[in-house]
């Protein structure tokens, strides 16, 4: 028998999908020939291999992309065409490929970012045509995509461009075509509120693009948006996202003690199997916990920028954000879940610059709500269940009953003050905390609302902060705006002392502030001397505190001459009797504070926007 002309080829060590060959053929081929239409038809019919595509692009430097820019331009142009074709699965595959490609290409380091990126994606001659087609295709898919899956993939592509090209002029094309109606309609139609995080993040990034340098139409859109149904959907999305973000902290360290059970008791002595108890989850080491906490919050935290934009620009949104409730849930309010997550964030804000920036944006948001008289009133009247972080000592007392939002906010500010003390103090963080407390106390005083709260914890924390500032004065005095922080802090304590009768719920709360001033008397004097507070704009307020402390200290010292040891009850009695001989000069302007001005925080807001861009890129891949 004659030998067959067919020969058996050796079996390859590994098989790879056909699309991987096309990736290499497209991006490693240096010739400038146009790929035939059949190539592109096959390319977008094949299911993308995101991992291989991403790795291939990672291996290319910016200069390599410029060398194959002709093929990159062809890819982008054809991907836009197929993404808008409405033909399945080519449209979905094209969007997936665009997501990977744009994320990788826009993350490269270019010598001339704007012009080089334009050269890679479209070419200088065709940039208007290509990008106008891109934004039109994305907007159409977001607003009227045939499936939610297509709509969300279009959002991801837009997020890639918005986050990757944030520092270039390319986002101008996104401001020329208004995506806001499409994004809001998509959010309204989504069944799962958690899915709305990406459209919301996209809206927030677009609203922050060059907003301090030029007119941004998304700013107006945020301010004018009044569709209550969609606003409620947005609030629910914020609620769900904040629950997810908070649960990531809890997964590292569960700060709610497990209730007693027979199974738990048997497990404690090694007999848990008898009660069918689940085996204990291994507890991470302290170093492991530190590393995990440093990674928090997750990338979904970029949505906090959008929350800020809505609260600052739109009073109707703020009212619904505070007043919306979710039926059938134990913790039933978007604002409660937002504040709950913030409380966890504040206890760990010092762990990374990213966490600090997100803490700042949430404090900007809370400050804006507190400054609005109607919202502040709601905060003082609305009572909801709210879980506050108890992951780090010192811990505030556990309150079994539901409390007002205002009381919870004060707790959060105290926690933030107590848990972020460092020699390299984040002065901006503390100015925001103390400023929010000053605004709340001012509102309570003027509205004569007697807020039920453990006020002694506030006095203790504020005066402990004074002691910290005194001990580390040499390290802290050179810090930028430290004097402004001290001025606000002293005014807050003095205002609480002089106006306490108008907002404290009982006489014991008022007595306690005098008691604490006596207790911290030596620290107050040292504090005044360390920061030269006997002169300047803070002098009058500081002198009141020192005078009150000295007045009661002298009375107590006089009694000690008669009685060897005084009990706390006897000291309190002396303080009450001392009111008759205490004279305090009225100090005007203690309740004065400036309304929030966004322009004063321009540099910080730009940094936060860049951080949100980085999180957006991490979110889509």
Predicted regions and their residues:
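Long amphipathic alpha-helical scaffold regions
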Residues: 2-252
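Core helices of alpha-solenoid repeat scaffolds
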Residues: 16-19, 68-76, 123-135, 172-181, ...
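Short, flexible coil/linker elements and helix-boundary hinge sites characteristic
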Residues: 27-28, 270, 583
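Helix-loop junctions that connect tandem helical modules in alpha-solenoid scaffolds
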Residues: 29, 77-92, 136-149, 182-193, ...
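HEAT-repeat alpha-solenoid elements in large eukaryotic scaffold proteins
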Residues: 30-59, 88-120, 148-164, 203-219, ...
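Residue-level detector of extended alpha-helical repeat arrays and alpha-solenoid scaffolds
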Residues: 91, 151, 196, 300-303, ...
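Alpha-helical repeat/alpha-solenoid scaffolds of the HEAT/ARM/MIF4G superfamily
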Residues: 107, 111-115, 167-392
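Eukaryotic scaffolding regions of large macromolecular assemblies
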Residues: 340-343, 350, 356-621
